[in-house]
Amino acid sequence: MTQLLLPIIYLAFISLGLPDSLLGSAWPTMYPQLGIPFSYAGILSMIISLGTIVSSLNSDRLTRALGTGRVTALSVGMTAAALFGFSVSGQFWMLCLWAVPYGLGAGSVDAALNNYVALHYESRHMSWLHCMWGVGTTIGPVVMGAALSGGLSWNSGYRYIALFQIALSAVLFCSLPLWRKRPDAAPDGTVPKALTLPQVFALPGAKEVMLCFFCYCALETTAGLWASSYLTLVRQVPAQTAASFASLFYIGITVGRGVCGFLTLKLSDDQMIRLGFAVLGVGIAALLLPGTQVFALAGLVLVGLGCAPIYPSVIHATPAHFGVQHSQAVIGIQMSSAYVGNLAMPPLFGVLANNITPALFPFYLLVFLVLMALMHRQLVRKTAHA
């Protein structure tokens, strides 16, 4: 059953990434056709993020009641419906309505699948599965670009991705008997407990892992959003070169996770996390070096490579840190804190850059790296004695 389920889970992780990059790639075409301000993309992004936060916080109870297979199939079906809704929408308010199931579906499947893989598969699969998420985020804009360059509308790009999600949802529903044969209980037979939020927060190390995830996602999203502007405005890198290296940041994360899958054969999750911190530190230091642009460009790629092992390794270590009976609940709050970091921290840097200077970019990343490293150290210490 393990070998039969694994390809389905890989496909599910690709499907998680497909919608994540669609809005950004389609928005330059969408907003003039809809007759709305450019900034309204932030409203849609906020609605989607709030939906993912809500569903992540409730993923523990949902997964306990329905099982990982049903939650995954229903959630992918929900996102498929939302994407199809986007494809037939001609007004902004319609997009806002469809953004609600879009976010709710994404949060539930993210938390449920991550916990299932952490319980049942080796660390290398967690790295490779998150690499597949990166593949999905790469395919999404390619599909949208192909639709637009072929003379079709942005609605068609969303429709193509929706059809893929609908097909995957059908595969997931057909695979439900496989999930039943591989129950959500851990290999030792331990059944996860449903916990209230106060009970989760009271677990030793829970606050630390939440802050660790918050800082990681704040750093990753801020770097991805503002790196090109920093290179252009502060380091005088030509705009085209800066844009290319900004894309290499995400390629670095995706390729890095593929490589990290092999490194996990020799290194533990906590060692992989510390390795990521070290590479991140070198990358941020390179961004700070004055003079030649080469250091800044290389630093950005290193920041992407440093990010690669952290997210999947923190998730995979959750059952070891908190116990398999608590892992689903803890991963749910990890996901929600990650989305809060994604939602709040990149705009905050925009305010700082606008009112002070964009040269604060590497220092802003450094604050999150230091805090993340401190929280991880506290997490390991507290859970070792729990």
Describe the function of each predicted region.
Residues G35, G67, V88-W93, Q236, ...:
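Helix-breaking motifs and short loop linkers at transmembrane-helix boundaries and internal kinks
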Residues V54-W93:
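Conserved MFS/SLC helix-loop-helix module at the cytosolic interface between two early adjacent transmembrane helices
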Residues L129-R180:
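Helix-loop-helix hairpin linking two adjacent transmembrane segments in secondary transporters
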